Amino acid sequence: EFGENPNDVNAYAASTFYAVDRFASYQRVWKNDYASGGLILSDRYTTSNAVHQGGKLEGKAREEFFSWLYDLEFNRMGLPKPDLVLWLDMPVEIAESLMRKRESDTGTKADIHERDDGYLHKCREVAQQAADYFGWTRVSCVRDGRLRSIEDIHEELYAHVQSCLEEI
């Protein structure tokens, strides 16, 4: 409806659509749980906008976008700021290898973004910048050039969550 590829919609417009969707979800689904002290876990939350939409911009324009996005979602819309963001960092080459294995194991095909090597590299670059800008906690999924075990990554994630819960 808005174009043939993701770049047909500018980062600010696309981010606004997703932010409004998050706002509606917050108001309808999890606001009361959050207000009563419930623990809310989210996969991608505002971080997805920072990475995918931030990738449409370069240099200073990207940092200005990060600032705008933070203001839009947390100040103007009043969405709760996360106490902790865990970014699972993985080199693109290893991610691509895992996607090929998944395709082979399940008989499925990678989506249009997963097949775009340039897009994957751009997303990782933007995620690294966003992690620095927003203060995300980086969890490397690779050690000494090899994929860490699920259990090893889990233990690190659990330790970060446990530490955060002790602080709040």
Identify the meaning behind each predicted range.
Residues 41, 84-86, 137-139:
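Hydrophobic/aromatic beta-strand patches that form the interior of the parallel beta-sheet core
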Residues 93-168:
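NTP-dependent small-molecule kinase module
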Residues 1-71, 75-77:
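ATP-dependent small-molecule kinase phosphotransfer cores
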Residues 4, 15-16, 81, 113, ...:
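Residues at structural and domain junctions
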Residues 47-125:
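A glycine- and Lys/Arg-enriched "phosphate-lid" helix/loop adjacent to the NTP-binding pocket
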Residues 37-38, 82, 133-136:
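A generic structural signal for alpha->beta connector loops
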